[in-house]
Every structure is written in structure tokens, then in C-alpha cells.
């Protein structure tokens, strides 16, 4: 019998791709003159906790926290409320969210008002400049649907 989704861990291959993608992302932030990651919010499930641990080693956020609003079944509105609250409380210049499908795809499509983006594979990521977490309230800066194809 398979491992329940909440307890499923990242594979060794997934950990490797994630570490490479995090390094590439960190380098991209520097090249683009974008702010360093200030806050990291992640779903309480095992693999997102593991992802957050790997990201924290590479991105060095000053604030990390589990966010129930990022667990499977959460709505885009819950994610938006989470972003609004984090921005009010911490005023981070850069917030990273680690969550699951379909929430990730829904939030990216909604906030960027773009329904035609390639879907993210596990470990894929997108970077948005969020003015407001509502439809069309963000500009897509970077889209990396496949973590095995590291963007430079």
C-alpha cells in the first residue's frame, strides 16, 4: 500500500533538482537586482516542509512559517489572504510560497491573469511581482514549469 499523501517525502532526485533550482533562482535574483527572500511560507505536508528546508539553506529567509492556507484543498482566496497578512505583518520585500497543485496553478493564473501558462510540474516555480493578490494584481517575472530545466 502506498504512502499517504501527507506523509510522502521528496525523492532524492527531487531534492537534487530543487537544490539546483534554488541556486539558480538565488543567482537570478542577484543578477536582476531583485530583493532577497524575506519570508517563506509553506504547507504543513511533509514534502513541502522538506522543500522549505532546502530552500531556506539556499535562500536564507529571515522568517519561515507553516501556513495551513497552503495545504491541498485551499483556495486562491486563502492564499491571497495569507499573502496580504504577511505583507502587513512583515512587509517583506520577497515572499516565497511552497504549496501544491492545483492551488499553485490557480494562484499564478489568477494573479497574473494568464490562463495559458504551461502547468508547473512538481518542483516547478514561478516568480510574480504582486501588487495585490487579486485577478490581474501581479506581473509574471519568471516561469519555470520544469525543475529539471534550470533557468539561468
Mark where each language-model region is.
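Active-site-proximal alpha-helix that buttresses catalytic centers in soluble enzyme cores
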Residues: 1-68, 74, 117-118, 123
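Active-site catalytic microenvironments for nucleophilic, acid-base chemistry
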Residues: 24, 54-58, 85, 110-114, ...
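Generic beta-sheet signal
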Residues: 38, 91-99, 103
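Hydrophobic packing residues within well-ordered alpha-helices of enzyme cores
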Residues: 51-55, 79, 107-108
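Conserved beta-strand termini and adjacent loop/short-helix elements that scaffold enzyme active sites
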Residues: 67-69, 143-144
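Short phosphate-binding loop-to-helix
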Residues: 71-87
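Domain-level recognition of soluble alpha/beta enzyme cores
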Residues: 112-151
